[in-house]
């Protein structure tokens, strides 16, 4: 059985073109979502996936109707394949029921994976270059080294941690991370406050 899926985009608010193409392709049932593909919660797609059985084919007008990212598409088509369900995209000439269609889709998947790895590699190289220039990522430290040392001296003088945390406007947990307490000190701090 051929099951169709249509989705509107922000550019094309009418599904008639998609719907007509799916009807001409022989789809017996068509499910529809009237929202952008950026949302992951698509009730029409969920209903279509639930309806599909082994041997059926999910048909879309174009790949981007099914998912915005290649990673999502490959994951979805992989799930379909595991369930014994084929996939067809009319305008992209992809049909996973044939060996050539499966091969073409795998090549697209490999290219998407390579692109993702290249992005990670470039990001890591950029971060390393920034570190070499003395730039550190993340937010600037709340206190200077001297302020942390001063906070440590206050704690050593017996000032309660809560009070020191208030003085320096830091969370109590941050203070514990910078100046770990011995077990006896923790119990004393709890009794004082």
UniProtKB/Swiss-Prot annotation:
Pfam families: HTH_7, Resolvase. PROSITE patterns: RECOMBINASES_1, RECOMBINASES_2, RECOMBINASES_3. It comes from Escherichia phage Mu. Keywords: DNA integration, DNA invertase, DNA recombination, DNA-binding, Host cytoplasm, Hydrolase, Late protein, Ligase, Viral receptor tropism switching, Virus entry into host cell. CDD domains: HTH_Hin_like, SR_ResInv. The gene is gin. InterPro entries: Homeodomain-like_sf (IPR009057), Recombinase_CS (IPR006118), Resolv_N (IPR006119), Resolvase-like_N_sf (IPR036162), Resolvase_HTH_dom (IPR006120), SSR_resolvase (IPR050639). This is Serine recombinase gin. Residues 138-183 bind DNA. Coiled coil: none annotated. Induction: Expressed in the late phase of the viral replicative cycle. Expression of late genes is activated by the viral late transcription activator C. It comes from the Viruses. The dimerization region is in the N-terminus. The active site is at residue 9. It is found in: Host cytoplasm. One of its GO terms (biological process) is symbiont entry into host cell.
